[in-house]
Design a protein with these regions (language model features):
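Conserved acyl-CoA
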Residues: 111-126, 147
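Acetyl-CoA-dependent GNAT
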Residues: 20-26, 31-102, 113-115, 119, ...
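Short hydrophobic/aromatic beta-strand or adjacent loop that forms the aromatic wall/cage
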Residues: 70, 165-171
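Conserved acetyl-CoA-binding loop of GNAT-fold acetyltransferases
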Residues: 142-152
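Single conserved hydrophobic/aromatic residue that forms the stacking wall/gate
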Residues: 1-15
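Conserved glycine-rich acetyl-CoA-binding loop
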Residues: 96-114, 131-139, 143-144
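Conserved beta-strand-loop-alpha-helix junction that forms the acyl-donor binding cleft
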Residues: 104, 127-138, 154-159, 163-167
Length: 176
């Protein structure tokens, strides 16, 4: 657990990053995952598709990923989970970095990405994926030394009735 005390206008806020171990923590991660995915996909997919992005949809995925070697972490502010990130030690991947809308703009995303990268010391150049329309995340990743190395999945309204705006998943690699 990482703790820090941030002092501003006589108020001390405790924040920490914790390994997801319990069912309650896994459910909190699934809730953040769903909120993050809906936020990122808003404007790019039809409402029906966004409505399907629920914690109940992502909980089995996170549980399966845990079985496959993924490790998930939650960030807490005042004991309330407000961000999540997952890492895979064998492959050097970082995924599922989501910060709640109410917690954005406080450096939590940067802290979580740095935390995740440092959890992979055996991988000099870890990788992550990001939707190209997620410009805020792309800007953060670039500032932190990540570079686009390719495109993966593409979403095309002409080929998928759930998609309303073209986008693609970019792969980024940490270059330092």
């Amino acid at each position: 657990e990482i703790c820090a005390c941030l002092v501003g206008s006589e108020m001390c806020i405790r924040d920490s990053v914790r390994l997801v171990k319990t069912a309650e923590q896994m459910e909190a991660a699934a809730k953040l995952f769903a909120e993050g995915r809906r936020s990122i996909c808003a404007g790019g997919w039809v409402q029906e598709a966004l409505d399907a992005l629920t914690p109940e949809m992502f909980l089995p995925q996170l549980q399966q990923e845990k079985q496959e070697g993924w490790v998930c972490y939650l960030h807490y502010t005042k004991d309330v989970p407000d961000a999540t990130v997952s890492v895979h030690h064998k492959t050097g991947q970082v995924e599922h970095l989501f910060v709640t809308e109410s917690a954005r703009g406080r450096g939590i995303g940067q802290k979580m990405l740095d935390f995740a990268r440092k959890k992979l010391p055996e991988h000099e150049h870890p990788v992550l994926t990001v939707l190209n329309t997620n410009t805020r995340a792309l800007a953060l990743y670039r500032r932190m030394g990540w570079q686009v190395v390719g495109a993966k999945e593409k979403f095309d309204p002409a080929k998928d009735p759930l998609v309303v705006r073209p986008s693609q998943v970019l792969e980024m690699r940490y270059q330092g």
